[in-house]
């Protein structure tokens, strides 16, 4: 018998939020050939609380395609993240806010 600490959950893939992320990521790295692949992580996240409330929740890294993914070590020993990835992920998050809130502003 499996003793779950939380109910398994997921968010739909084709959403307004994901479209805003795609647009913003493309702009932040100045490329329109980025391929998007949904995946499942074995990590633990607070999304178990937000999804229960009906909030679409994604894990998103925003890694820059020119940074070496083999050097990225998030949440591990000698944790590091490429500078280009830090800049592009920050631009992407700001872009997502703009895309989603633009009609309101």
What are these regions, as identified by a protein language model?
Residues 1-94, 98-105:
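Metal-dependent amide/peptide-bond hydrolase catalytic core
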